[in-house]
């Protein structure tokens, strides 16, 4: 029942020991199978146990408890989906520095594969006064073909290099941005 789930979760959180929850079938009847949802003696639960715990909290509309679980998933099972989900959750909590850190960890592990991820990371790096790394990230995305060579991304690369006082590295990006620009301001 809902009350038993709440009590089990509360007890597990209070003592930080493993708990077992009965598995229910589609009709809500117990199947006789038990699933451990807590952390093991070593301090790290199986990935599916964290996912089950996260699903329970989501189902109970206890979103406050989801973030620490995603943090553990990203730390113990460093997959792209956990790093990007963690970054998004930090963003929702207005924790931009942590948001940047999660995306940067995914980038360092070569997990990013979407333009929006490269641009988000480069913007956060620039915002936190690291224009050189911002330029390297956007340049890396451009070189890999993940980031499209369009005016706004080329202009961003140029501005990031310019801000890091690397004018020679900024020039080619300003030129490329000017070529694809519909306006003449970059010439």
Language-model segments: residues:
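Alpha-solenoid helical repeat scaffolds
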Residues: 1-187
